[in-house]
Amino acid sequence: MQKQEPISNQTQIFRHDARGCFVEAKCDRFHLDRVHLQFVAYDKNRPQGQRYTNNVNIYIPIPEFLVLYQEAASGVLHGRMQQYKTTGQQESLYEHMGGTPASTLARLGKARPDGKSVSRVTKLVAGSRSDYLFVADSGPGDQNEQGLTLLPIGAGWRYP
């Protein structure tokens, strides 16, 4: 009997592909009461195993994610999206901010060369070619007085 290769996406719940990028929901952080969304950009021209060009991991608390799900399932989110498109509003339909403090990165041996924290932001916005666009930003951040890691405007990497 031939040995079966391990499945690399065994924690994947779903995956949505776009041109040169994808987002997947994973169940590997449920024990921490978080939904894990991984946003990935890739280049098909690179050799297999080296195709990822950028990657942002977002961890949303399950209660917050369930509120977003309920808004989507009930049609409230779709109604708000239609209203935003009609009035030309540029606000996010949903936004989640998170990050990792510089002290935690240093303790884990993953400190940034500039010594800063890592900030991660995800937004659900009304799209121009499609109804929705899920966007993730990651980059160097600074902690404010409340302990929130903030991403400076225009800094970081954006998906898609």
Predicted regions and their residues:
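Positively charged, low-complexity terminal tracts
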Residues: 1-160
